[in-house]
Amino acid sequence: LNEALKVEGPPPAWAVNAGGPNGALPGSSANATLVLEPGTYAMLCRIPSPDGKSHLSKGMILGMEVQPTTEPVAAMPGGDIQMGLFDYGFSMTPPPTAGTHTFVVTNQAQQPHEVVLVRLEAGQTMEPWTAWLKGGMQGPPPGMPFAGITDINPGQVQNFTAELAPGTYGLICFVPDAGDGQPHVFHGMSTTFTVS
């Protein structure tokens, strides 16, 4: 399992995306709510190191067993913002306002997607992110990622909670495309929104 998942690019066909919280900056935390079926799971990190290699390829992976239970499984909690992921974009209803929100994320697409929520400078677009990625991710990223969920398959639903201050934000998907292996952001899967 460890060796197969360390290979860059899409996961092997036998590995099923389960989602989870997206990466957290040093000293911070991230959250996600999901329902796990009994089975074997791997927690891993695909975030690139300064040398361009993923943390996963350097060994950042941990196996986990989810045991069956005879207790009823709790229902997925609701949220106040519905977010759709599609090939290659995002939808949000209603538009976010300042404050703490729980995003209910549904993959409405034909392939896996993720959502990375980033804080941007006022008036910033997503072009600096694309340039940073195409330039080999040299230096710090052009915004501060702080919330979201990792890859979920078509039809999967997960939640995450984030506190939004007034400002400019971006949504990005870095999942490798099923067709050409390029990150979905290169296919236009990024957008900005403003919170007032």
Residue map of PLM features:
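Short edge beta-strand/loop segments characteristic of extracellular beta-sandwich folds
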Residues: 102-108
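Aromatic/His-enriched, Gly/Pro-containing loop or helix-boundary segments
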Residues: 12-28
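Extracytoplasmic/periplasmic copper-protein system
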Residues: 1-11, 15, 50-91, 95, ...
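Short strand-edge motifs at loop-to-beta-strand transitions and within beta-strands
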Residues: 28-34, 156-162, 191
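Beta-strand signatures of extracellular beta-sandwich domains
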Residues: 114-118
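Intrinsic, low-complexity N-terminal interaction/targeting segments
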Residues: 148-149
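A short tyrosine-centered beta-strand micro-motif
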Residues: 39-45, 101, 164-173
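Surface-exposed loops/turns
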Residues: 26, 37-38, 97-98, 154, ...
